[in-house]
Structures are given as structure tokens and as C-alpha cells.
């Protein structure tokens, strides 16, 4: 059954969302819910990313699915906030049916997931500044696509995978990354992924999942947790910077996303962006033309 187009499946998905919304809205500190995690991966087309039981859909069908899920939640919880979680294929793969347009128009805010193990780390290598600039680049890319300059941003996933960030550099990686984010216009929240390491008693996880936490699986804070605690007050006090430099431009189709691959971390645009960020100490703007 197709996860995005089959009427029975969509009915079941909508019902789950309605029931969750009905229960969660009773909690005094709950403000909304996210459909995730990276559900559009089931429609992915990129080599190496294609799901073994892929659910094929068109761009219009992806749009309909997003709207259906959003409406199910809003019907039950009108005052709640609703988000979607997208992996970065959405920003970089030309023929992905989920497009940047979807990310910047659906839900309460634009969410970004930043992982350096996929493309940035393999291209630039351990310790390269591109790794700590990558989350900010994604946020600037999201801003470039958005028709609303005031649309909120949420860096929903960012972490220090030990495949490219060794233990002795994890704390510095975290503080440098967070420093690059603090001045981002519209950024409302950052979620460091994740809270705790996965226990080695749990088998069959990818190796990097066992060491992503701010805490060990028994609750001991790791160096990056202690470093984060120290910088949080500064992060709260930092103000977004008005970016005056001329933006770096790229061309991509609003409706289909065709051309978005030029923004990939394997391309020249990202290299130019990182070089300028390192030279000036400020994140360059991006502009879609």
C-alpha cells in the first residue's frame, strides 16, 4: 500500500494524528506536534537513499498528503502548532517529489535536519570548517526559498556523529556550530540530536547511533553537554544580524524544485558559501533567482 496516495492508508494516518492531537492538547505544556521522522524518505529517489519499499508519488500528491495530515491535526487542535520533519534530500535532489516549496509553506515553521555524515563530512573531511557551517547553510537555504521573510525556522536535528566528529572534538564542534547559528534571522529553536546515547544492549542500530547523545545511556553528561550548558545563556542573548552583503545566487524552479541540486554540499555554491563565511566570519545570504 502506498503511504502517500492510498485512501485507506491516508485515512489511518489522519486518524492517528487526530487521536494524538486530542490527547496532547490536554497537556498544559504541549504546544503542537511534528509528523516525522523524515517521513518523505519513503518517496526518496536518490541513489543510496531509495527505500526498499518505496511509495512513489508525484509533487502534487505529496502536496495533498501534507495538507491532509495538517488538516487532520488542525481539525482536532486548532490552536496547536504543526510541523513536518524533512531530511536534506528535499533541498538537494532535483527529482524528489517533496520539494523546498513544500518545506517553506507547509506547517507552522520550516524545519531543517543537518547531518554531516552524508555529504559534507565525506567531501571535506574531519575538522573542516564546512562541517560546523553546514547547519547555518541549510537555514540560509530555507530562507532563500521562503516567500515569507518572517517565517520561523527550527533546526530540528543537528548532532556530532562520531563518523566525522571524534570524541575529543565533540564539545568544540558543538560550541562552534551553535555560535554560527545564534545570529540566524527567524531561528526559533535548535534541537541537538539526541539527548542520550543508545545503549549497546540494543542491537542492530547503525554504529553512529550509539554515540550521538549529549549524555551516555546511563545519564552521565558528556563534554558536549557541559559545553552546551555553558553557552546557552549567551545564545539566548545573541541577536539576529542584518546581513548587508550581496547574496550568493542560485537558480531553481519554485514549483518543481528542478535545479536545487546546484545547492548540494558536493557543488561549487556550497564551497563558495563556506569560503566567504570563513573569510568574513559571517554567514552569507542566499537568493533563489
Task: Give the role of each language-model region.
Residues 1-102:
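Active-site mouth of glycoside hydrolases
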Residues 2-12, 39, 51-62, 121-133, ...:
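The substrate-binding groove and active-site-proximal loops of carbohydrate-active enzymes
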Residues 8, 13, 184-289:
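Aromatic-rich peripheral "rim/lid" segments of glycoside hydrolase catalytic domains that contact
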Residues 20, 33, 73, 110, ...:
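Conserved, mostly hydrophobic/aromatic
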Residues 59-60, 75-163:
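Glycoside hydrolase catalytic-domain groove-lining segments
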Residues 164-178, 202-209:
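Histidine/acidic-residue-rich catalytic or RNA/ligand-binding cores of hydrolases
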Amino acid at each position: 500500500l502506498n503511504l502517500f496516495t492510498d485512501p485507506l492508508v491516508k485515512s489511518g494516518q489522519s486518524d492517528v494524528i487526530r487521536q494524538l492531537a486530542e490527547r496532547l492538547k490536554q497537556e498544559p505544556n504541549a504546544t503542537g506536534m511534528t509528523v516525522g521522522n523524515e517521513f518523505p524518505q519513503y518517496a526518496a529517489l536518490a541513489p543510496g537513499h531509495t527505500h526498499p519499499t518505496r511509495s512513489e508519488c508525484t509533487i502534487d500528491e505529496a502536496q495533498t498528503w501534507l495538507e491532509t495530515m495538517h488538516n487532520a491535526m488542525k481539525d482536532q487542535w486548532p490552536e496547536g502548532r504543526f510541523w513536518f520533519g524533512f531530511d536534506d534530500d528535499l533541498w538537494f535532489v532535483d527529482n524528489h517529489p517533496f520539494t523546498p516549496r513544500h518545506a517553506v509553506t507547509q506547517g507552522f515553521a520550516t524545519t531543517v535536519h543537518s547531518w554531516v555524515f552524508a555529504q559534507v563530512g565525506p567531501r571535506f573531511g574531519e575538522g573542516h570548517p564546512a562541517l560546523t557551517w553546514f547547519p547555518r547553510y541549510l537555514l540560509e537555504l530555507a530562507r532563500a526559498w521562503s516567500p515569507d521573510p518572517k517565517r520561523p525556522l527550527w533546526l530540528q536535528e543537528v548532532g556530532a556523529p562520531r563518523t566525522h566528529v571524534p570524541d575529543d572534538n565533540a564539545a568544540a564542534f558543538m560550541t562552534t556550530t551553535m555560535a554560527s547559528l545564534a545570529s540566524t534571522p527567524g531561528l526559533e529553536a535548535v534541537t541537538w540530536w539526541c539527548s542520550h546515547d543508545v545503549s549497546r544492549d540494543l542491537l542492530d542500530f547503525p554504529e553512529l547511533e550509539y554515540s550521538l547523545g549529549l549524555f551516555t545511556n546511563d545519564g552521565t553528561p558528556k563534554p558536549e553537554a557541559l559545553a552546551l550548558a555553558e553557552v546557552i545563556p549567551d545564545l539566548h542573548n545573541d541577536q539576529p544580524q542584518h546581513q548587508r552583503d550581496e547574496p550568493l545566487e542560485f537558480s531553481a524552479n519554485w514549483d518543481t524544485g528542478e535545479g536545487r541540486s546546484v545547492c548540494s554540499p558536493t557543488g561549487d555554491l556550497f564551497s563558495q558559501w563556506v569560503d566567504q563565511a570563513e573569510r568574513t566570519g559571517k554567514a552569507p545570504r542566499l537568493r533563489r533567482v
